Amino acid sequence: MIVRERVDGDLDGCVDALAQVHDCDGYPNMWPQNPHRWLSSPTVVKAWVGESDGRVVGHVAVDREVAGAPTTAGSIAVSRLFVHPHARGNGLSGALLDAVTDFAAESQLELVLDVVEDALPAIALYERRGWVYVDERLADWTRTDGVRPVERRYRLPR
């Protein structure tokens, strides 16, 4: 497994991996109308992929928005973190988060993120890695079942 900066040619592989994650875990909660654009929205500052045997199997980005609103001055949000179900269990999620953490440290930015409260494996990962719970709120979007999930907000101390 290697982690490297994402390039435009990676997007098809990212979408393929994301589709597998969506089928397995329901992430993202609502499949984007244009997944290529969802992964490379104008607010994305930088993105990385995890690659195994020449295939994209993981992804993470940093974004100027969190939960649909601009981040505060001096912070940047982790977004679009996912790992293909067949590539899990080897530390790739942590390696992708390391890339984000290194970027934030070099840029002197605080990292923040939001995660739905029922994403227990993701929450466990963040808390194991030192992320601190800040607060929670109802999401400004609804799931396909009409429920507005609770989003937990975290920050990573510098």
Where are these regions (language model features)?
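Short hydrophobic/aromatic beta-strand or adjacent loop that forms the aromatic wall/cage
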Residues: 45, 148-154
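Active-site acidic-Proline motif in GNAT/NAT acetyltransferases
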Residues: 84-86, 90, 117-118
